[in-house]
Design a protein with these regions (language model features):
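Hydrophobic alpha-helical segments, chiefly the membrane-spanning helices
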Residues: 1-333
């Protein structure tokens, strides 16, 4: 597929990029629906399904792109895809929601989730600079990937533990896709078809997206980092933006910030963990700068959220403006 895309007309490459996005997004939807149905048939608690299968499903497109980019040596794209998605989720998705309706912020998001996401971003920054486990430095190696995956497993275990405890105490536990009503029960053969077909679509979509993005970057004289931070990251995050806008219009965005922060944690620990465990990822100076921007933006949102326990229209507008300023910066740098 790579050779075909490299020799195809530019307009056709754009079409392939869109096809790649569709395969990634719909493949993730089918995979999550099939897996959730099987888990429900096996009597796995809905809370656990919501915290694992459903939550991780939103990061499957980024996983496929970064893993494919890492394997094919497109390291800049592997890292920038994750960092770009995190910045877009945080500043644009939440910012647009807040411009439509005030986003209430849970106490746990302020005291636990945002600080942990900062720790994850800081860990990525430190490991990238030090190149732990690799002589070349400025690299995420196999050992780094193991650290990330281990941290991710610990994070999931902790979240499941506190969610089950809260549920037993009769407290309301709000988790995306974490209720029986959210999980559709479909036949076993159809579930298997969804899982296998979804996984195949994700894998193929990841390869097509990486090949098309690399070709576009080459033809337009753009770096893979810029393509990853803009076109690819925005493309894989569009479903979250559309879903959040619809939810905002229905005034159902109380979980919006918590979901965005959770997705950002998954992107760093799971996506880059798997990608670097499979194949080492080189970290360039631009990646370090973008990570610093992510950390600064996260702190800004933390301040916005912690001040009044909510994010209003002014804060939301400020977040979108900050993203646009950042977008202009990465284009002209």
């Amino acid at each position: 597929m790579g050779n075909f895309i490299n020799n195809a007309p530019f307009a056709l490459v754009i079409v392939f990029l869109i096809i790649g996005f569709v395969l990634l997004i719909k493949g993730a939807d089918f995979f999550v629906e099939g897996s959730s149905s099987v888990a429900k048939r096996l009597h796995v608690p809905s809370i656990i399904i919501g915290l694992t299968i459903v939550a991780m499903g939103t990061s499957l497109p980024e996983t496929a792109v970064s893993v494919s980019a890492s394997i094919t040596g497109n390291n800049e794209l592997a890292v920038s895809n994750v960092v770009g998605s995190n910045i877009f989720n945080l500043m644009v998705v939440i910012g647009v929601c807040a411009m439509i309706v005030t986003v209430n912020v849970a106490k746990e998001t302020i005291k636990r989730d945002i600080p942990f996401s900062l720790i994850c971003a800081g860990l990525l920054l430190i490991l990238g600079i030090l190149g732990v486990g690799d002589k070349s430095g400025m690299m995420l190696g196999h050992f780094d990937g193991v650290i990330f995956i281990g941290a991710f497993a610990g994070y999931i275990f902790y979240m499941i533990k506190i969610a089950l405890k809260a549920s037993k105490e009769g407290k309301k536990v709000e988790i995306e896709g974490g209720s029986d009503e959210d999980i559709k029960l479909i036949s076993v053969p159809l579930s298997i078809l969804f899982i296998v077909g979804g996984a195949a679509a994700i894998a193929v979509g990841g390869d097509i997206t990486v090949d098309a993005a690399s070709r576009i970057a080459s033809d337009l004289g753009m770096s893979q980092t810029l393509i990853g931070l803009t076109i690819v990251s925005i493309g894989t995050s569009l479903p979250e933006l559309v879903t959040s806008i619809v939810a905002a219009r229905k005034n159902e965005v109380d979980m919006a910030l918590g979901n965005a922060i959770g997705s950002n944690v998954f992107n760093i620990l799971m996506v880059l963990g798997i990608a670097s465990a499979i194949s080492p990822i080189s970290i360039i100076t631009e990646n370090i700068i973008d990570l610093c921007v992510l950390i600064v933006f996260t702190i800004c949102v933390w301040i916005f959220a912690g001040t009044r326990k909510k994010i209003g229209r002014i804060e939301g507008f400020s977040m979108v403006v900050l993203y646009l300023i950042y977008a202009v910066y990465i284009i002209i740098r």
